[in-house]
């Protein structure tokens, strides 16, 4: 009908597809049980199939608008490039960095500069790139920028290959937990030894813009 549904899951949003009152195993964030009191939207497709949006913390949202207006929607038009796309490259960074006074951690998590990188992966990317999370973006050398771009793509592809990171809520489309949390280099490893060879530093935890940040006391001390 020339309309589009935009759905954001937030932190705890889940989609359940029911057929004859039974949850499909293909439900996104599939679980066998869910609390009906957290159902916020119900879409009836036919007499036997319904889609339910369930969200405990209510950080997500659903919007319906005309398809022709998708690119002008405020939630989409201000997004930065996909980090796995060709558009996220050295030339893009060279054009963007001079305008930015943020530290590297906040830059990676700011959706208007690069979309889709959350706290976990920002920590992992910065560590692999041996950059202090408090370092200002405009102080990065061209060599570090190239390394950062390379590691953004490397970490995200590795996380996808392992099914994501299931610390608490996240589940894959079939209800399975991800396994990338077993590969964490710094995230949630406060007090542990750095995994980089010949480093020996300890992982420290600080807060940057009220978000937990983990980094190595030696190889990221720059």
Short names for language-model regions:
Residues 15, 92-222:
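Basic, nucleic-acid-binding surfaces and adjacent catalytic neighborhoods in DNA/RNA-processing proteins
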Residues 4, 49-50, 202, 212:
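Short, solvent-exposed loop/turn motifs
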Residues 1, 44-48, 196-198:
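Short acidic, glycine-rich loop/turn motifs
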Residues 5-116, 121-128:
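Phosphate/anion-contacting hairpin/loop surfaces
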């Amino acid at each position: 009908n020339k309309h589009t549904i935009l759905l954001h899951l937030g932190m705890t949003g889940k989609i359940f597809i029911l057929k004859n009152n039974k949850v499909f195993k293909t439900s996104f964030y599939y679980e066998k049980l869910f609390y009906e009191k957290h159902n916020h939207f119900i879409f009836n497709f036919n007499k036997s199939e319904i889609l339910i949006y369930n969200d405990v913390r209510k950080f997500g949202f659903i919007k319906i608008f005309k398809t022709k207006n998708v690119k002008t929607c405020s939630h989409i038009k201000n997004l930065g490039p996909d980090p796995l796309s060709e558009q996220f490259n050295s030339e893009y960074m060279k054009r963007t960095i001079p305008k930015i006074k943020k530290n590297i951690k906040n830059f990676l998590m700011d959706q208007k500069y690069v979309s889709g990188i959350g706290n976990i992966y920002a920590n992992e990317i910065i560590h692999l790139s041996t950059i202090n999370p408090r370092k200002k973006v405009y102080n990065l050398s061209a060599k570090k920028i190239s390394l950062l771009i390379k590691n953004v793509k490397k970490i995200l592809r590795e996380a996808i290959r392992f099914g994501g990171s299931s610390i608490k809520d996240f589940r894959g489309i079939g209800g399975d937990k991800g396994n990338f949390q077993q590969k964490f280099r710094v995230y949630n490893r406060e007090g542990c030894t750095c995994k980089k060879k010949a480093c020996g530093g300890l992982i420290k935890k600080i807060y940057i813009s009220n978000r937990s940040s983990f980094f190595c006391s030696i190889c990221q001390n720059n």
